[in-house]
C-alpha cells in the first residue's frame, strides 16, 4: 500500500499546507517559546524553544529525563506550560484554547499522538473498534470511515487482528494498532514517542516506510528516539536536548553518545 495525494488515507494537502493562505507568511506548524514545565517541584522542561515547519520530519534526541516525553505531551495538549508559550499553526495553545470545545476537537484531530507505552492509549474491546474510534468522532460518511479503518489496519498489518482484544496482543502488535488508530484520523502532524521501541525488524521497516511516505505527502512528523541510526535512515532533522535542558541542532554523526543519543 502506498500513500499519495488523494490516495489511501485521503491525504488532505490543503490541510497539510496550513490555514494561512497561499502567498502569506506561513507560521511554523509547531513553535515553543521559552517553555517551562515543572512536576512535583522538579523542573522538567526549562526554557525550551523550538519549531517544526510543515512537511518536516524532526527527531528529538537526548538522555532519559531531559524532557522529551514532556515536550511531546505539551505539544499534544496533555500538559500546559507553566511559563512561555506554545503556538500551533500560529494559534496560542493554552487553557482557554483547550476549553473551547470546537477548537480543541479540531486541534486533537490535527495532532496525532502515539505514546511510548501503547497500553496508555488502547481502551476498546477489539482492534477494529480501536482503529475506528477516532475517525468515528469526525462525522465521516460510513463508506469513508470504513475505508480509513481498513486502509490503516492494512498499512500497519493488523487487519487479521480486527476482532482480537488489544490487551492480548504482543508489545509490537499493540504499537502497530496504536499507530493505525491515530493514522486513521489523518492528522496534519504525527507526534510519536519512541515509535520503534519494542518492534521487530519487519515492523520497524513498516513504520519507517510509512513515515517517509507520510512526509512525502506533505504531512509533518515529530518523534523522540534514542537511536541515531533511525534518525539517519529517516533523514530527519535532529534536535538534541541535553541533561541541562539545552537545545542543540547538529548533524547526527557529530553529536556523540555521551550526550544521550545512541547508535
Feature map (PLM): residue ranges:
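The feature captures the beta-strand-to-loop junction immediately N-terminal to the Walker
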Residues: 61-63
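Conserved ABC ATPase "signature" region
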Residues: 143-161
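Helix-to-loop junction immediately C-terminal to a conserved catalytic motif
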Residues: 76
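Conserved ABC transporter NBD signature motif
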Residues: 84-96, 107
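H-loop/switch region of ABC-family ATPase nucleotide-binding domains
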Residues: 225-226
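Catalytic Walker B motif of ABC-type/P-loop ATPase nucleotide-binding domains
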Residues: 190-193
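Conserved ABC ATPase signature
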Residues: 165-169, 173
